Structures are given as C-alpha cells and as structure tokens.
Amino acid sequence: MPPRRRTTPAAGSAALDAWRADPDGVDRATRGTAVRYTLDELGARAPGRSVEVRVPPFGAVQCVEGPRHTRGTPPNVVEADADTWLRLAAGDLTWDAALAGGRLRVSGTRAHLEALLPLVRPTTFGASASGMSR
C-alpha cells in the first residue's frame, strides 16, 4: 500500500511553484507545504523503510526498499534544511555540491539518493515548475 500523502498534489504543486518563484520571500507555511509535497513524492517514487529523509521542522519520510529499522535511530539517514532539500528536489543543486558544501548530512550505505533526484522538471520560462514527472 502506498504511503498516505500529507499534502494534496494541487496544494503541493502551488507551494512548490511559489517557492521556485521567490525562494527567499515565500512564507514559512508555503515552504513547509512544498517540503511535505516533495517528501511525499520521494516516498511514492521510492517506497520502503530503509532510509529516513528528514527536513526539520517540516517533515520526514521513510523510503527506499531494503532492510528496515523498527526502533531508535535508523541506520540510513539524510537530513537537510528546507531550502537545501527543495533545491535538490527541484534540480537547482546537485547531491555532490550539497555534500561538499556541508548542506546535507548523510549516514549509512543506502542513504545516497542522487539517482532519485531531482523530483521535478527544471523550470522553463513561463512554465509551471512542479510537473512531478521525470
């Protein structure tokens, strides 16, 4: 059974479009909705429970098939601030650049998600940013 989405695609898409249009000026609620939407999308694309992706304080998702944890801190964790995560999800920042810049904390052998990113199509002039197909 696929994970339950916390954000409707319409609301998430609108929030992501607003963030892409003005990352520094978007309000906290809109940023949070965009984060939850992209985390939901990651969970839908890579179902599983072997990696936990955390974007405090807005949300977390477990994803990627493999051994799952049941108690305590999971062995495979990815953590980023909201803007770093959204830039990764949007294709505006590469995994390697985020790691090299210290903007991404990764632990565990399964926690490298670069093959799953970006989650949205790059923007083109006048087009919606949040078409969630690859």
Label each PLM-derived region with a short phrase.
Residues M1-R134:
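Feature captures hydrophobic
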